Amino acid sequence: MAPLTKKTNGKRSAKEVSHSEKKLAKKPRISIDSSDEESELSKKEDAVSSSSDDDDLDDLSTSDSEAEEEADELDISDDSEEHENENEEKEGKDKSEGGENGNHTEQRKLLKERKMQRKSGTQVQQIKSVWERLRVKTPPLPKQIREKLSNEIWELSKDCISDLVLKHDASRIVQTLVKYSSKDRREQIVDALKGKFYVLATSAYGKYLLVKLLHYGSRSSRQTIINELHGSLRKLMRHREGAYVVEDLFVLYATHEQRQQMIKEFWGSEYAVFRETHKDLTIEKVCESSIEKRNIIARNLIGTITASVEKGSTGFQILHAAMREYVKIANEKEISEMIELLHEQFAELVHTPEGSDVACTLVARANAKERKLILKALKNHAEKLIKNEYGNIVFITILNCVDDTVLVFKTFSPTVKEHLQEFIIDKFGRRPWLYILLGLDGKYFSPIVKNELLRYIELSKATSKKDPLQRRHELLSKFAPMFLSTISKDYSSILTENLGCQFIAEVLINDELYAQLNEKDQEKYQQVLNNILTTFKGDITEEEHPIHRAFSTRLLKALIQGGKWNNKEKKVIPLKNVQGLGVPFAEKLYDEIIDSSNLLEWINNADSSFTIVALYETLKDQKEGKPFLKDLRGVQSKITTDESNKGSQLLAKLLK
């Protein structure tokens, strides 16, 4: 679910979006349980506020005229009491406490009589008395009692349900009924409310009922609601209450086909009215067929986008979907205007798939000046951007497309330096750095992601001048020392993570990176190797020894081999530039960590035996390996070859 922010000076804060965006499951903007209980009344408007904090109280006290009248009646008592006190002081009379109580009682009686005289007033009071028993959560009601009370409420309300749904307490009654009713009864409620869904969507109280109907309703009832709202979505997107209903409908409840139906409405009224005729059309096909249609669609889309952004709805996923339609057909001038409109709230785009696509397209098609504005807007959100499932794609696109690598490094390096340890062990946070190290390697970038990034690179060719490889090498030369410093400082914790070991291997077994290092950084590189060796010291019979972690063993084996494994040729390709891996590392590992006293123990341990196999394959034809081979022959007869130790079996076979 897109993150929720409050409106500030007509626009929602990008910072608030950044702080609230982390999520694994989409959450509704309008809480399903927000208005079931009185205790939640005080926070239900906070949960969906689309304007200022003052609007929260306004919504509860003034949005519904009858609720306002009730509140006014109750408030009369204080004003009346004060007025009477003043008069009595002038006349020298004392007002008794009993008189005050009598005044309150009289006013409440009058208020109750007025309520009873309203339409369905008697039924509402009867229904509320039953509802008070049904809505109890502690202790939970037995199922039979709950069904009995639900049936009783339905019998009392089925003929006047349309009179209940827009009233404060009465609306909550119907919400509870929807929550605890059977599928058939929910369908009946939906049928009873046909023709009122737009009114519900724009009501401060009715919107909660509408969201409950979407949440608990069947596929057919959702389609009924969508069909009725169709033609009004653009209007709802500009409405304070309605925008949140449309967003939840699009994100949480609509099918892919229904989403397409909803988005086409933003093209214009023609596509809202004749939706079946244009069912299979894409925006590109429509715009190719007629320049006039293209201009109308573009005008309608940017009108909705502009109004929603100014209202503070930039973070809405449905708006991102409309933006994606627009950027598909926008010319260079329109792209520039779009960037001007959005650059201050750019961080609000990156947390949804549609918004990420829009952000990447704008970055790719922007000129140097516009890219600078975008980078400035994202600077304070770098950590969230890089770790986000979709935000990291935007960041990689920036690395791919922005020629000013000095600006990129200057903008993001403070955050990267502080959080790099977290990034390299994060599923998404590590991808930008793997791109800098390896390019769009299929090992880390799926075909879908890779093709998307290649599409953005193609779009950027109109405004980006540098060769992509040159740009990547410039970034590598700037970030490589940071990689080494972080690994050298935090190697002990990084090596306990699978993704961390994988990243260290890609940093160390990398000719491109080593070629970018100066003499000082090369010394730091060797220090990292020494630190890794130190990690493997100790008794391998202890459970906490890193040799018992499969990913740590893979890293050690890769450093011993000193090259990149080629899956096609099924062999290790030696490195050309890197110093200290392969034979030197293997020799040092044996001399300083294993030695003759522990060799047999390493061979007969199932977790470490393949490390000895790697040592043998690397050192067998090298003069540096003579001490190792001599010691190996000395313990050959004591090697155990049981079924649980495949490594020792392989080693025994190689030694024959």
UniProtKB/Swiss-Prot annotation:
GO biological process, one term: protein stabilization
Domain PUM-HD: 133-483
Stretches forming Pumilio repeats: 155-191, 192-227, 228-264, 340-376, 377-413, 415-450
Region Disordered, residue ranges: 1-107
Effect of S34A: Increases translation repression of ASH1 mRNA
PROSITE patterns linked to this entry: PUM (PS50302), PUM_HD (PS50303)
Positions where Phosphoserine occurs in the chain: S31, S34, S35
Highest rank taxon of the organism: Eukaryota
Compositional bias of kind Basic and acidic residues: 13-23, 90-107
Gene Ontology cellular-component terms listed: cellular bud tip; large ribosomal subunit; nucleolus; nucleus; preribosome, large subunit precursor; protein folding chaperone complex
Post-translational modification: phosphorylation by CK2 relieves translational repression activity.
Ranges of biased composition (kind: Acidic residues): 52-89
A Pfam family recorded for this sequence: CPL
GO terms for MF: large ribosomal subunit rRNA binding; mRNA 3'-UTR binding; mRNA 5'-UTR binding; mRNA binding; mRNA regulatory element binding translation repressor activity
Alphabetized UniProt keyword annotations: Nucleus, Phosphoprotein, Repeat, Repressor, RNA-binding, Translation regulation, Transport
Location in the cell: Bud tip; Nucleus, Nucleolus
Subunit structure: Component of the ASH1 mRNP composed of at least PUF6, SHE2, SHE3, SHE1 and the ASH1 mRNA. Interacts with SHE2 and FUN12.
Function: RNA-binding protein involved in post-transcriptional regulation. Component of the ASH1 mRNP which transports the ASH1 mRNA to the distal tip of the bud, where the ASH1 protein is translated and targeted to the daughter cell nucleus. Binds to the ASH1 3'-UTR containing the PUF consensus UUGU segment and represses its translation. This silencing of ASH1 mRNA is critical for asymmetric seggregation of ASH1 to the daughter cell nucleus.
Other noteworthy facts: Present with 21500 molecules/cell in log phase SD medium.
Similarity comment text for this entry: Belongs to the PUF6 family.
UniProt name for this protein: Pumilio homology domain family member 6
Organism field: Saccharomyces cerevisiae (strain ATCC 204508 / S288c) (Baker's yeast)
Gene: PUF6
